[in-house]
Amino acid sequence: MGFRLITQLKGMSVFLVLFPTLLLVMLTGAQRACPKNCRCDGKIVYCESHAFADIPENISGGSQGLSLRFNSIQKLKSNQFAGLNQLIWLYLDHNYISSVDEDAFQGIRRLKELILSSNKITYLHNKTFHPVPNLRNLDLSYNKLQTLQSEQFKGLRKLIILHLRSNSLKTVPIRVFQDCRNLDFLDLGYNRLRSLSRNAFAGLLKLKELHLEHNQFSKINFAHFPRLFNLRSIYLQWNRIRSVSQGLTWTWSSLHTLDLSGNDIQAIEPGTFKCLPNLQKLNLDSNKLTNVSQETVNAWISLISITLSGNMWECSRSICPLFYWLKNFKGNKESTMICAGPKHIQGEKVSDAVETYNICSDVQVVNTERSHLAPQTPQKPPFIPKPTIFKPDAVPATLEAVSPSPGFQIPGTDHEYEHVSFHKIIAGSVALFLSVAMILLVIYVSWKRYPASMKQLQQHSLMKRRRKKARESERQMNSPLQEYYVDYKPTNSETMDISVNGSGPCTYTISGSRECEIPHHVKPLPYYSYDQPVIGYCQAHQPLHINKAYEAVSIEQDDSPSLELGRDHSFIATIARSAAPAIYLERITN
């Protein structure tokens, strides 16, 4: 019993070791399986530019992307891709596909992107795309499709982008796009469409961009685009459109771009653009327009860009409404509008001709909708004037056409500017208050947190002021008008004369180098007495006046020691200017 159990356990252990290894080898082999002449990158298979006439074999069932571009495939058979149920995108462009079986795409329900452009497809069955309801992007451009079936796109509720460009389509069936509720982009350009049924685009509630250029339309009525509430751009250039009318009972407020260039438009019906209040970009170049009515330019209230070159402008009084509108227009515009008539001004610029020949000098043209102000706020809904908000001296909206447009102003603009200025003043005051409060807070915190530092700063500033005052006082004391110095340095011979005769010459050097002689006795201190100041000051650096003669005193009255002959003596006398002048003599014996 135990032996059997051990044997079974050994067998199970061998199985547990070998099974994962075998599974890993199988998975690795499956991942490495790649068709001949193809390149595999994980779950993406590239079989491009190898002249494949059919779908290659041995493509892994777990592939999520398959590119068969630039090959020689001529036909898509039934269940051609049934084994590729994980496929997310499939590229079949630039082949020679002329027929597609209605069950060709069975089994690839997860497919989100299908590219069939640049082939030779002339017909598609009504149910061709029903097996792929998760499509987001479908490209059928550059084929030879002549018609679309009524249920061609039924069930494609997740479709976002649809390319039908450059085919041979002549009509668009009624409600053919009914189920394409999320369609954002539709390209029908470069076909042979001559007319549109009223409900051709019914159901495209989220459509934002529509291309209809290079077709064969002869007239356009905006009523053919019912309830396209989100459409922002429509391209109708290079058709054969001769007239444009509106016929809408609703306002098409979402449309921002309208391209009508390269057509045969000779005139625009009055009121055509009234249903497009938010139109920002309008292309009317390369048509046959001779003039634009006043009612038409009045409806261009939100334009920020316009092209008008290449038309047959008649430079007469009928051009004046457009001329004045362009003169006040602040957006992007062309300056190459050329006169086609009258004969004598053919080839001249419209603006130059009007000003040179005074064509509009006696014509009063107005703009009731203020289109020249629209570029300042292109994204906002247009301002519709109401008589109730006008100033007392303003005219009603219905009679606005009486006054010229250059002087027109929006009511309430001054008040808006006043509010803006008031807000700026408040903001500036608040900013100033916060700045001062911040400075005071920093000072207070510094004073509280570092009191010693604040005291040192105060002491430093006080010492600085004291030093400054001391320097000023010293500068005043050292002025040349404050003190005078008189030096006396007798020579040896003069000393002998003084000793023998009792008198002799002496030299007083005062600023200005003035000299005088005074009698000098051997004992100088007792000999000086005066009733009035000895020195009289007239002006600064004036000659020194001696007011008192020197009188000798008897030897008996002198108790001071006498000078000895034969010795060198020097006397220095200093005279200082003070309230009571006095003369001091200091004797120095060398």
Curated annotation (Swiss-Prot):
Top-level taxon of origin: Eukaryota
GO terms for cellular component: AMPA glutamate receptor complex; GABA-ergic synapse; glutamatergic synapse; membrane; photoreceptor ribbon synapse; postsynaptic membrane; synapse
LRR repeats: 62-83, 86-107, 110-131, 134-155, 158-179, 182-203, 206-226, 230-251, 254-275, 278-299
Extracellular face of the membrane: 31-424
Family statement drawn from the similarity comment of this UniProt entry: Belongs to the LRRTM family.
Functional summary from the UniProt entry: May play a role in the development and maintenance of the vertebrate nervous system. Exhibits strong synaptogenic activity, restricted to excitatory presynaptic differentiation.
Subunit and partners: Peripherally associated with AMPAR complex. AMPAR complex consists of an inner core made of 4 pore-forming GluA/GRIA proteins (GRIA1, GRIA2, GRIA3 and GRIA4) and 4 major auxiliary subunits arranged in a twofold symmetry. One of the two pairs of distinct binding sites is occupied either by CNIH2, CNIH3 or CACNG2, CACNG3. The other harbors CACNG2, CACNG3, CACNG4, CACNG8 or GSG1L. This inner core of AMPAR complex is complemented by outer core constituents binding directly to the GluA/GRIA proteins at sites distinct from the interaction sites of the inner core constituents.
Protein name per Swiss-Prot or TrEMBL: Leucine-rich repeat transmembrane neuronal protein 4
Native source organism of the sequence: Mus musculus (Mouse)
